[in-house]
Design a protein with these regions (language model features):
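Long, highly charged low-complexity segments
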Residues: 1-51, 63-88
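Charged catalytic and DNA/RNA-contacting regions of genome-maintenance
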Residues: 54, 89-96, 100-131
Length: 131
């Protein structure tokens, strides 16, 4: 409906990243999506990460973009962000879903993250419903 509250956030500080992590830890299902520089997961660099835990609520963590002049999180944004999110992404008790999540898993593996707890892939579901 028109009056439905929408909570969309851009994570630009370590405090905001820590708030996101608290929200992710308390959820039943985490939707994950990466924005990258390539469709080839072997060479893709992470441009940003998106997370959602409920309808009309999401977070985006920008890593690389044209207007970027300084690091947001420190010397190496991606390393700081990945190090903070790694425990959640590797926690098999936290269910995760995504669109073509296999791609995201391959990219994150190159960054040292072995994502666990995959529960659903919307791309596979779409293919099964409409082969």
């Amino acid at each position: 409906t028109k009056d439905q509250k929408k909570d969309y956030y851009t994570v630009l500080t370590l405090d905001q990243l820590d708030d996101l992590i608290i929200n992710l830890k308390s959820s039943n299902l985490i939707s994950l999506d990466l924005e990258t520089t390539s469709t080839n997961p072997s060479i893709a660099e992470i441009v940003g990460l998106s997370f959602s835990i409920s309808k009309n609520s999401a977070w985006y963590i920008p890593i690389m973009y044209p207007e970027k002049k300084d690091d947001i999180f420190g010397k190496k944004d991606i390393e700081v962000v990945i190090n903070r999110l790694k425990n959640i992404l590797e926690d098999s008790s936290l269910a995760k879903t995504g669109q073509n999540i296999k791609y995201d898993l391959h990219v994150l593996k190159r960054y040292g993250v072995n994502v666990q707890g995959i529960a659903f892939d919307t791309m596979i579901a779409a293919h099964l419903l409409n082969p």
